[in-house]
Design a protein with these regions (language model features):
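Extended ligand-binding regions for polar small-molecule ligands
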Residues: 48-74, 81, 109-121, 180-206, ...
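Extracytoplasmic small-molecule ligand-binding "clamshell" domains
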Residues: 39-40, 46-153, 157-161, 222-236, ...
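A ligand-binding cleft/hinge motif common to bilobed small-molecule-binding domains
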Residues: 135, 150-162, 208-215, 236-271, ...
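Substrate-binding/active-site groove segments that recognize
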Residues: 196, 201, 426, 431, ...
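Periplasmic-binding protein-like
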Residues: 95-96, 158, 167-183, 227, ...
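Export/targeting segments at the very N-terminus of extracytoplasmic proteins
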Residues: 315, 551-600, 633-636, 650-654, ...
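Catalytic and substrate-binding regions of cell-wall glycan-acting enzymes that process beta-1,4-linked
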Residues: 503, 517, 527, 658, ...
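Bilobed "Venus flytrap"/periplasmic-binding protein-like clamshell domains
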Residues: 90-99, 103-120, 154, 173-230, ...
Length: 741
C-alpha cells in the first residue's frame, strides 16, 4: 500500500469487524482497532491523493471566546547589573531557530558559542530570541525585548546613531554574487550599470550600491526583497537563476561556498566593513564587558585558515578546529541541534581545553588527513581507525573506541559463512578506508575476490543502505556502525568479523578508533591521551555510547493502540481539544501526533533528550515559555503551539493541508531539512509545495552524498520524516473514522 493511499473503505470494514468482536469480550476490555498498516519509508508516486478529502483543508474555526495567548516576556532595558539580577542574557538573532549545518566558520555558530561563553563568565543563562525580520532587530533592542543583537550587523554611521556597537568581531568585504556559469556576468563595478541587484532595504549593502549607482554604475537598479528573507536564501535564489545578482559579506559567502557550488563571487563593492554586536546606548556596563571579552577571546583567534600550532598556540587562539564528516554517527544536525558520537567527544575535549569548538567538514573522507597536515584543522575526530598506513602520516591518540570490522550482507540475500567463501565475490569499499587495507591483506590468503572501489564522498552508511536494497552484494563496516544502522532498519546482518594482523587491541574489538593530530603536535596529542584516559567508560562516555550505538530509535509497535467505545482516543483528549482549539489545529491530528511521539506517555524522554507527550526539546520548550514538559498540560501546550508556529513558517499561499504535512516533517527532522528537500524538489521539477509524491521523494535524497553535501543543513535520514508523516496521516484517518467530530 502507498504511504499516502490509506483505504477508507477497508478501514471502515475493519472497524465493523472489531466492534463485532468486542461484543464477545468483557465490558472491561475496550475494543482495539488494528493499528494503521505498516508504512515502508518510500516515497509515494505523484498521483491524485485519496487522503486529501479527509485531511484538514483549513484550520478549524476558533472557539467563540479563545483563551488569551501567553503574555509576551516583560520588556527590560537595564544595564549589566540589572541583567545579572534577572539571571538571563537575552540575545536577539535573525532568522530561523536552526543554523546551517556548521561545516566551517559559520558566523551564527561562532556568535552563539562566544555568547554562551560570555554568559557563563558573567554567571548568566543565555536566551536567543528570533526577530521576525531583519529590520525589526534594532527596534526590538531599543524597546527592551532583548539585551544585545548578534546578527552579523555591519557598523554604519546611521545605525550608530540608534545603538552602541561593541568592538568589531570581524572585518569583511561585500561581494557581488552571481550564478556560476551564467552568461554575461559583471566582472567589475562599472558593469553593474543597468543591472538589477536584489538585497534587503535595511541591509548595509544598499549604501554601497547607492554609491555605485550615483557614480561609476549609473542606472544600477536596487530591487528590495522581503525583510524576513535571509541573505543565504537570496544567494540560493541567485544560484538557481531565479534572481540575477545579490550581495553578501565575504565570511558568510565562504560558508555558503562550502556546500553550494553554483555560487560565484564576482568582485567586492566595499572592503574593510566591520561586523559587531550591538547594545542600547544607555547600557555602557554591558558594552564594556563585551568589549573586554571580545579583546580576550576574539582578537586572539587565528588570522588565517592555515595554522599548524601545537596546544599552547591553540589555547592562545581560543579555538579548536576539528575535522570530521557529516553522517548519522559522527556529526549531524537534528531538530536544529548538533549531534554525533565523535562530535560529543570533540566538544568535551574543547571544553576541557577551555577553547571554542569549530567544526570543519572536508568534501570527502580522503581529504581528512591532507587537510590536517595542511593546517586546515587541528584534530581529526571522524571515527578514524588506527592503521599502520595512517600512522605514517599522522599521530594517533589513545583509542576512544574499539570495534571489529565485519563483512556485511543482506539478510535475505546470498549468505557467506566463512573466509573461505570470499573467493569470487565482489566487496564494495572506499579505497581510503581501513577496510580496503584489511581486504588487501586477505587477498593473499583467501583470494581471489574483487574489491570494488567506491567514491570517497560515499559514507559507510550509504554502502550499508545499498546492501540492504540489494544494489550491491557485500561491504565492510565497523561493528558499531552496523549495530546503529540495525536500530533503524531490518535487512542487514554481519556475516563474520574480518581478522586483522597482530594481536587484538582490546577484548572489545581488534581495531582502535582515535583522534588524529599532526606528528609534530606532541603536546596536543598528550592532552588528548589524558582526556581519553579520563573520559573512557565514564558516565558521559557510556551515555553517548548508548545514545548512538545501543539505543534503538525505531518506533516500537509492541504497545497496542486502543480506542474505547466511548470515543476516547487517550486519557488526554480534553487537553488536546483545548489547545488544538486555541491554536487552530484538529485535535484528532494532534492526538495522532502525540501517539506517534510518545505512545501517550508524558514521562517519556527520548535519546536526544526530548520530553513529554509531544517530545519537545527542552531548548524549544524554554523558547516557548515552558519548563515542565513532562506535565501533560504543559507538554501538550508546547507541542501544539510549536506545530502552529511550524505551519505558519511555510508560505500562506501553500494549501493548508500541505503546510500541515511540511510542519509534521519539520517537527520530526527539523525545518531546515524540509526546506532543503523543497529546494531539491524544485530542482528536480517536482512540486516544492506538495508533500506526498514530491517533497517526500526529495527528503529521501538527503541520505545521498551528492545531495546532502550541497544541502544547507547537511545529512538527514530522510526515511524517518517520510515514515513519520505517513503514519500520522494514516492514524489520523482512523481517528476521524472513529470520531467524526
Amino acid at each position: 500500500m502507498s504511504s499516502s493511499g490509506f483505504n477508507l473503505s477497508r478501514s471502515r470494514w475493519l472497524l465493523v469487524a472489531v466492534l463485532a468482536l468486542s461484543m464477545a469480550c468483557e465490558r472491561s476490555q475496550p475494543p482495539a482497532p488494528p493499528p494503521p498498516p505498516p508504512v515502508v519509508a518510500k516515497a509515494s508516486t505523484p498521483a491524485p491523493e485519496p487522503e486529501d478529502p479527509i485531511f484538514p483543508e483549513a484550520p478549524p474555526p476558533p472557539p467563540p471566546a479563545p483563551p488569551a495567548p501567553p503574555p509576551e516576556p516583560p520588556k527590560a532595558t537595564g544595564d549589566l547589573a540589572a541583567i545579572r539580577g534577572g539571571g538571563t542574557l537575552r540575545v536577539l538573532v535573525e532568522g530561523t531557530d536552526e543554523d546551517f549545518l556548521p561545516r566551517q566558520g559559520m558566523p551564527k555558530a561562532q556568535d552563539r558559542a562566544l555568547l554562551e561563553r560570555f554568559a557563563e563568565k558573567q554567571g548568566l543563562a543565555v536566551e536567543f530570541i528570533q526577530a521576525p525580520a531583519f529590520d525589526q532587530l534594532i527596534p526590538m533592542l531599543r524597546e527592551g525585548r532583548g539585551d544585545l543583537i548578534a546578527a552579523d550587523l555591519t557598523v554604519t554611521p546611521a545605525r550608530a546613531k540608534e545603538i552602541a556597537f561593541t568592538r568589531p568581531l570581524r572585518v569583511v568585504s561585500e561581494f557581488v554574487v552571481g550564478k556560476r556559469g551564467a552568461a554575461e556576468l559583471p566582472r567589475k563595478p562599472e558593469q553593474l550599470a543597468g543591472r538589477t541587484v536584489h538585497v534587503r532595504e535595511s541591509n548595509s549593502f544598499v549604501d554601497s550600491l547607492r554609491e555605485l549607482a550615483q557614480g561609476k554604475a549609473s542606472g544600477l537598479v536596487i530591487a528590495p526583497v522581503p525583510e524576513s528573507t535571509e541573505t543565504e536564501e537570496i544567494v540560493y535564489q541567485v544560484s538557481r537563476g531565479e534572481l540575477p545578482l545579490t550581495v553578501a559579506d565575504s565570511h558568510l559567502l565562504t560558508a555558503i561556498e562550502a556546500y553550494n557550488p553554483d555560487v560565484e563571487r564576482l568582485f567586492p563593492i566595499a572592503e574593510g566593513r566591520q561586523i559587531a554586536w550591538a547594545v542600547r546606548q544607555e547600557n555602557p556596563g554591558l558594552k564594556l564587558a563585551l568589549d573586554s571579552f571580545i579583546t580576550e577571546h576574539v582578537l586572539t583567534e587565528y588570522a588565517s585558515e592555515r595554522f599548524t600550532g601545537d596546544l599552547a598556540a591553540i589555547r592562545k587562539r581560543g579555538v579548536l578546529r576539528v575535522l570530521t564528516r557529516n553522517n548519522p554517527i559522527t556529526y549531524f544536525l537534528h531538530r536544529g541541534e548538533q549531534y554525533g558520537f565523535d562530535f560529543e567527544l570533540a566538544r568535551a575535549a574543547a571544553e576541557e581545553m577551555g577553547v571554542r569548538l569549530e567544526i570543519v567538514v572536508p568534501p570527502s573522507r580522503d581529504l581528512l588527513i591532507p587537510w590536517l597536515n595542511e593546517g586546515r584543522g587541528d584534530v581529526i575526530a571522524a571515527s578514524l581507525t588506527v592503521t599502520p598506513e595512517r600512522s605514517a602520516e599522522v599521530a594517533f591518540s589513545r583509542p576512544y573506541l574499539f570495534v571489529e570490522e565485519v563483512l556485511v550482507q543482506r539478510a535475505s540475500g546470498p549468505k557467506l559463512a566463512s573466509l573461505a567463501e570470499l573467493k569470487g565475490q565482489k566487496i564494495h569499499v572506499r579505497a581510503s578506508s581501513s577496510y580496503h587495507s584489511t581486504l588487501l591483506a586477505l587477498q593473499k590468503t583467501h583470494g581471489p575476490f574483487e574489491i570494488v572501489q567506491e567514491p570517497e564522498d560515499l559514507e559507510t552508511e550509504a554502502l550499508l543502505d545499498r546492501v540492504a536494497e540489494g544494489e550491491i552484494p557485500f561491504t565492510v563496516a565497523d561493528s558499531h556502525l552496523l549495530t546503529a544502522e540495525q536500530s533503524y532498519r531490518d535487512g542487514l546482518e554481519a556475516a563474520f568479523p574480518l581478522p586483522v594482523e597482530g594481536a587484538p587491541a582490546s577484548k572489545e574489538g581488534s581495531r582502535g578508533i582515535a583522534f588524529a593530530v599532526r606528528k609534530d603536535a606532541t603536546k596536543l596529542r598528550g592532552f588528548l591521551d589524558g582526556f581519553v584516559k579520563k573520559m573512557y567508560r565514564g558516565t558521559l562516555y557510556n551515555m553517548w555510547r548508548k545514545r548512538y550505538f545501543e539505543n534503538s530509535r525505531r518506533v516500537t509497535e509492541a504497545k497496542v493502540e486502543r480506542v474505547e467505545v466511548s470515543g476516547t482516543l487517550s486519557p488526554y483528549d480534553s487537553i488536546f481539544q483545548s489547545y488544538s482549539s486555541r491554536y487552530g489545529m484538529d485535535w484528532r491530528l494532534m492526538a495522532a501526533q502525540a501517539y506517534q511521539e510518545s505512545r501517550f506517555n508524558p514521562k517519556l524522554k527520548s535519546w536526544v533528550g526530548a520530553i513529554g507527550l509531544f517530545q519537545v526539546m527542552p531548548a524549544t520548550g524554554r523558547q516557548l515559555g515552558f519548563r515542565k514538559l513532562e506535565d501533560p498540560d504543559e507538554g501538550t501546550h508546547a507541542g501544539v503551539m510549536y506545530m502552529q508556529q511550524l505551519v505558519n513558517r511555510f508560505e500562506p499561499g501553500i494549501p493548508f493541508k500541505h503546510r500541515l504535512r511540511f510542519a509534521l516533517a519539520s517537527y520530526n527532522a527539523g525545518y531546515g531539512h524540509v526546506q532543503d528537500a523543497r529546494r531539491i524538489a524544485r530542482e528536480k521539477g517536482w512540486n516544492p509545495d506538495k508533500w506526498f509524491g514530491h517533497v517526500e521523494k526529495a527528503m529521501l535524497l538527503l541520505e545521498r552524498p551528492q545531495y546532502y553535501r550541497r544541502a544547507r543543513y547537511g545529512y538527514c535520514r530522510g526515511s524517518e520524516p517520510v515514515k513519520y508523516v505517513s503514519e500520522i496521516q494514516n492514524r489520523y484517518v482512523s481517528y476521524v473514522d472513529l470520531i467524526p467530530h
